[in-house]
């Protein structure tokens, strides 16, 4: 058994070294500083907006994975076994409930509650993982019964945009039953933020109400150029 565990540990270490983006997220002081900085900026914005608004309902909308919870152990395990992401293994990882908070996340969530706000978790974890996700967030000090969790379903129309709309308007399965103001949106991908024609847009509100955390492990950029205005010249100067 000891030999087996040593072998697995060696495999995970090799996977981390082969996937420098995961090692950077897990081990670098810079990653911790960047995520903490983003959350501190978001907290300052929320507290400024909350002054004099305590009796009016408001919330922050946050993603879960690689925003509040660190899932790099899952990706290291998959890399060690040379396996791609798949839903069964991901659901099994969620069921463990062992993901730790991203640096700065727990303090931000606590600050929101201290300022009189509520937290809305809008995530593409599937609805079938709701209970284990709540348990993980609770263990990490980031869940209360006053929160809302809006997860992915098999209904293609239940997009993150629609979930955010329900939260703001107070209707549907995601809303609190009353309209609320959203003081901040935070996530590790642009899809976690309002679209151009939605609630002030994402770029226009960047650093004011919309906040992006670094995630070099995965995203739409893996499959094509996503940077606005970037011209691809096929190597021709």
Q: What feature does the model see in each segment?
A:
Residues 2-62, 226-237:
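Non-catalytic pre-domain segments flanking phosphatase-related domains
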Residues 47, 51, 74, 110-118, ...:
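Sec-exported extracytoplasmic/periplasmic mature domains
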Residues 53-78:
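Active-site-adjacent structural elements in enzyme catalytic domains
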